[in-house]
């Protein structure tokens, strides 16, 4: 099934690309989320009319993502308090949701699906390196320090 991408899709293409995808991917993801339209003559003409509008919208989204990534990189570290045992292991763990909430509380809006924990959830006290994928091609990283609540 051929579709025209209305947004940049990782591993598929850029805005405006005409790509061939499997029917299920198009019907269940691309079309309902508004990330693509079927590649008909009518849709091709409609897309050509709206191309500049969509490109400016995409450029604006990239600029916003870069600004958020700069804000995360400029933040020296993020400290999170959690209950821990005497050996430095946490009761529970710190996950993507906890990190996103702490950053949002600090004034930098981050969604939990943008947080990348390379070694899984954080389960020990100390410093941990956390990576963020804000947008396709826009990355950031931050040092998260976990301290004991006691």
UniProtKB/Swiss-Prot annotation:
Keywords: Ribonucleoprotein, Ribosomal protein, RNA-binding, rRNA-binding
Cited Gene3D superfamilies: Ribosomal protein L9, C-terminal domain, Ribosomal protein L9, N-terminal domain
Annotated signal sequence range: none
The keyword Nucleus appears for this protein: no
BP term (GO), one: translation
Superkingdom: Bacteria
PROSITE patterns reported for this sequence: RIBOSOMAL_L9
A GO molecular-function annotation: structural constituent of ribosome
Pfam family name, one: Ribosomal_L9_N
TM regions (residue ranges): none
One of the record's GO cellular component terms: ribonucleoprotein complex
Biological role: Binds to the 23S rRNA.
Listed HAMAP family: Ribosomal_bL9 (MF_00503)
Assigned protein family: Belongs to the bacterial ribosomal protein bL9 family.
The protein's name: Large ribosomal subunit protein bL9
Organism of derivation: Hamiltonella defensa subsp. Acyrthosiphon pisum (strain 5AT)
């Amino acid at each position: 099934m051929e579709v025209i991408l209305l947004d940049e899709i990782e591993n598929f293409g850029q805005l405006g690309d005409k790509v061939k995808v499997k029917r299920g991917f198009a019907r269940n993801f691309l079309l309902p989320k508004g990330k693509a339209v079927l590649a008909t003559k009518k849709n091709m003409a409609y897309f050509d009319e709206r191309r500049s509008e969509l490109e400016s919208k995409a450029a604006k989204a990239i600029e916003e993502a870069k600004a958020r990534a700069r804000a995360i990189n400029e933040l020296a570290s993020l400290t999170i308090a959690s209950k821990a045992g005497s050996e430095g292991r946490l009761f529970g763990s710190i996950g993507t949701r906890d990190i996103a909430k702490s950053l949002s509380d600090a004034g930098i809006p981050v969604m939990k699906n943008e947080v990348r924990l390379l070694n899984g959830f954080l389960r020990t006290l100390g410093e941990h390196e956390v990576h963020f994928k804000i947008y396709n091609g826009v990355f950031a990283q931050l040092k998260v320090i976990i301290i004991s609540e006691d």
